[in-house]
């Protein structure tokens, strides 16, 4: 990156807050907001992982955060062969690091569906993630084709495929943390590739600044992504793995099947870990 080009962290912030960063007030509030968001730490992290391989980038993030990850029902995760892990999304990017920390205890072949912007920070993350354009307006046939092609290869290689079907951090509704509506892609892929689905319920530290800003501004909320990753250092995460669900046990309708899984994970698996999925 040349001296004249903006840093990727600035670019991602500008894309998430175009009205704010394009307004006359931005030069005034930027120093304050950047201090609150821990901007220097985000720049340092991005610089550290930019040249790394996909495996090394994930390992770097794991070592940087040093999360305390507790698992329950971990025996329900197949130690080999294709499978699809679906999980709620309570805190943000750190959820993926917590899942990585858990899975790597028994498998070294996991691949994660993740926001395609990750490749703009560290290009070789393409070795360990399947990039997805989560902004519907930015999706193209080529991007979708590339995502599906990468997924097809992962299943052909009998890998463990991990998705957060909500695609974004959960929101607080009436005092309760609830995922956004789930995309149906996890169910569709599992069905197409005859893969068992492993449901996981995750809890972690509250992303307070995200939820505070969410009350006032979507743009302010969305620029907290790096802050809500780096402030999870040393925090506790709990992952409850449910028994694998065969795709044929789900509703034929992919959207309905996704809702069934979401409801099971948020309401039943969270409270009764030993109770298997039942449509």
Regions found by a protein language model. Name each.
Residues 45-74, 109-146:
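Membrane-interfacial amphipathic helices and adjacent loop/beta segments
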Residues 28, 36-40, 84-140:
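Catalytic core of membrane glycerolipid acyltransferases/transacylases, capturing the structured
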Residues 44-46, 86, 137-138, 172-174:
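Short, contiguous strand/loop micro-motifs
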């Amino acid at each position: 990156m040349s001296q004249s080009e903006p840093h990727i962290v600035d670019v991602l912030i500008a894309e998430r807050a175009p009205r704010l960063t394009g307004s006359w007030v931005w030069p005034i509030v930027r120093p304050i907001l950047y201090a609150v968001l821990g901007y220097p730490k985000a720049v340092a992290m991005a610089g550290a992982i930019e040249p790394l391989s996909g495996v090394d980038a994930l390992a770097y993030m794991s070592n940087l955060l040093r999360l305390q990850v507790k698992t329950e029902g971990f025996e329900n995760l197949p130690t080999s062969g294709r499978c699809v892990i679906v999980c709620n999304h309570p805190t943000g990017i750190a959820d993926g690091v917590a899942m990585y920390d858990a899975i790597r205890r028994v498998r070294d072949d996991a691949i994660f569906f993740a926001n395609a912007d990750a490749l703009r920070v560290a290009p070789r993350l393409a070795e360990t993630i399947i990039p997805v354009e989560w902004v519907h307006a930015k999706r193209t046939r080529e991007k979708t084709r590339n995502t599906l092609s990468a997924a097809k290869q992962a299943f052909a290689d009998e890998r463990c495929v991990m998705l957060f079907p909500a695609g974004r951090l959960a929101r607080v509704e009436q005092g309760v943390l609830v995922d956004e509506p789930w995309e149906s892609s996890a169910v569709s892929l599992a069905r197409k590739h005859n893969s068992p689905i492993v449901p996981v319920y995750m809890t972690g530290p509250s992303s307070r600044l995200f939820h505070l800003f969410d009350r006032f501004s979507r743009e302010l909320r969305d620029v907290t992504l790096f802050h809500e990753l780096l402030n999870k250092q040393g925090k506790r995460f709990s992952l409850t793995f449910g028994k694998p669900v065969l795709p044929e046990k789900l509703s034929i309708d992919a959207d309905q099947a996704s809702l069934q899984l979401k409801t099971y994970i948020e309401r039943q698996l969270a409270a009764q870990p030993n109770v298997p999925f039942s449509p």
